[in-house]
């Protein structure tokens, strides 16, 4: 399981049924393409603003070299992330 820390950016919906989203995690060294298939987690991430939040992501790589996110935490919480439940 890979743990990455960086800035959440370019959040997009891939599929609506079942809900699947992608986002770019920009670290100091590299940008990672991440996907989320868990509906509850994807719904919460869609409410976040691009380029504003520093996050920690745990997951594994799929065959397309994308990080499949299993755990997601916001490091710089504010009132919006607290309302959402991060």
What are these regions (language model features)?
Residues 7, 24-26, 58-60:
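Residue-level recognition of well-ordered beta-strand positions that form the cores
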Residues 60-86:
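OB-fold/S1-family single-stranded nucleic acid-binding modules
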Residues 16-38:
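OB-fold (S1/OB) nucleic-acid-binding surfaces
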Residues 40-57:
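Short nucleic-acid-contacting surface segments enriched for D/E, G, S/T with interspersed K/R
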Residues 2-4, 21, 30-32, 51-55:
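A generic structural signal for short beta-strands and their flanking turns/coil linkers
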Residues 1-17:
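Structural detector for short beta-strands of small beta-barrel domains
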Residues 10-12, 29, 61-63:
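Beta-strand elements of well-folded, non-transmembrane domains
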Residues 36-42, 73-76:
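A short, sequence-level motif marking secondary-structure junctions
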């Amino acid at each position: 399981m890979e743990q990455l820390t960086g800035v959440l950016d370019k959040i997009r919906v891939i599929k609506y049924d079942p809900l699947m989203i992608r986002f770019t995690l920009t670290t100091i060294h590299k940008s990672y393409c991440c996907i989320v298939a868990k509906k509850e987690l994807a719904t919460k991430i869609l409410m976040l603003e691009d380029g504003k939040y520093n996050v920690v992501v745990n997951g594994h790589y799929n065959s397309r070299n994308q990080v499949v996110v299993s755990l997601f935490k916001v490091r710089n919480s504010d009132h919006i992330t607290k309302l959402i439940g991060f």
